[in-house]
Amino acid sequence: MTPFMTEDFLLDTEFARRLYHDYAKDQPIFDYHCHLPPQQVAENYRFKNLYDIWLKGDHYKWRAMRTNGVPERLCTGDASDREKFDAWAATVPHTIGNPLYHWTHLELRRPFGITGKLLSPSTADEIWDQCNDLLAQDAFSARGIMKQMNVKMVGTTDDPIDSLEHHAVVAKDTSFDIKVLPSWRPDKAFNIEQATFNDYMAKLGEVSDTDIRRFADLQSALTKRLDHFAAHGCKVSDHALDVVLFAEATDAELDAILARRLAGETLSAHEVAQFKTAVLVFLGAEYARRGWVQQYHIGALRNNNLRQFKLLGPDVGFDSINDRPMAEELSKLLSKQNEENLLPKTILYCLNPRDNEVLGTMIGNFQGEGMPGKMQFGSGWWFNDQKDGMERQMTQLAQLGLLSRFVGMLTDSRSFLSYTRHEYFRRILCQMIGRWVAAGEAPADIALLGEMVKNICFNNARDYFAIELN
């Protein structure tokens, strides 16, 4: 019987253990997509307690707690921090088989140093007190944890109207050598069908000093904000393409669509598709000119529980996987961006694992001459960010493309404790390659495969995003 979560956790062959301990373990972290609050980095935030750093804002944990029968008051409600932590501690023993069980104990191990102890009601007091004592120390501030975890770069997720003032504070601080760069997330400028669109156009117009009436005005406003982001070191965009749409339009049609929407009219599905296509093609060209990377996160079915959405708002754990087809529209969109050779470096993520092979083959259609891995099939996202999901994604990428050129893992997280997801990924990667070697499916060449592992863990992402590190 193998003990739970030792130093060789998941490493079930001798070759996997060598790969992980000698090549993967000590690689720095290049976390190119996350949802960390940049203000907390700028202020070097001190966390009040374990709830504040661990449960606050974590919809993964809230979903599990609800499934375990925990009242909403103890998830997102007005219960005390300690009450919410105790509700989580009571839920954890029920999460065996869920990635939350592994994540929880990896996060207690690093950075808190808690090993050989499982979180449960019987250990909750001890773990609460031990972690809170550590959180009072300098090494456990927001920046302190990033340094402990050997982070070199994080890419936050930011709206085009954001001032980026917190990124500027971090950039000017010579005592802190971790890059904290904005990522451009223009969903609100793109989702013309949403009730909030007109208010957002007013805000975008204000910050860009642009009167947005025609489509060219919107392009001008977005260009000004792209320049603003570029001035703060941005090299990455991110789009939530819950459904991929494609429909072409003339300039006159786009002007009419925008004018009608700004006048409060409801658009047809075809008009929405025309507008979204035009925005994505325009932005893709801008990214290509600037050498940016675009990311498309495809296939989320959001805010399914309307009653809870009205009570709690979005991003609180009521989203799931969509099963809408995407292949034809995505192909047309990428081909359109590529017509003038203005398809930027692109990472495609799917939420439905049924679509893994769709994306794994799609990227091969648009690889760029002289650029290794220009088109990427992104790491297992959200509900696929677990052992089977990561194995599936990497296996299918290896079968249909080049795993060796993969840009690897990202946390996609709101928590400063989520950096152990990189460790989890690295262990799974080494386990997978180790099994290939054990089965005679890959050569037992530690130098060859060790270099490949180092590249996937860090070097490929560093080179792909072309961000100069401190």
Swiss-Prot record:
UniProt keyword annotation of Isomerase present: yes
Q: Name one Pfam family in it.
A: UxaC
Pathway stated in the Swiss-Prot or TrEMBL entry: Carbohydrate metabolism; pentose and glucuronate interconversion
Q: Which InterPro entries match?
A: Metal_Hydrolase, Uronate_isomerase
**What EC class does the entry list?**
isomerase
**Membrane listed as a keyword:** no
Q: Which reaction does it catalyse?
A: D-glucuronate = D-fructuronate; aldehydo-D-galacturonate = keto-D-tagaturonate
Q: Which UniProt keywords apply?
A: Isomerase
GO terms for molecular function, please?
A: glucuronate isomerase activity
Q: What is its EC number?
A: 5.3.1.12
Task: Please give the biological process terms from Gene Ontology that the record holds.
Answer: D-galacturonate catabolic process; D-glucuronate catabolic process
Q: What are the disulphide bonds in this sequence?
A: none
Q: Transmembrane segments in this chain: where?
A: none
Q: Which family does it belong to?
A: Belongs to the metallo-dependent hydrolases superfamily. Uronate isomerase family.
Query: What's the protein here called?
Result: Uronate isomerase
Species for this entry: Klebsiella pneumoniae (strain 342)
* Designated gene of the protein: uxaC
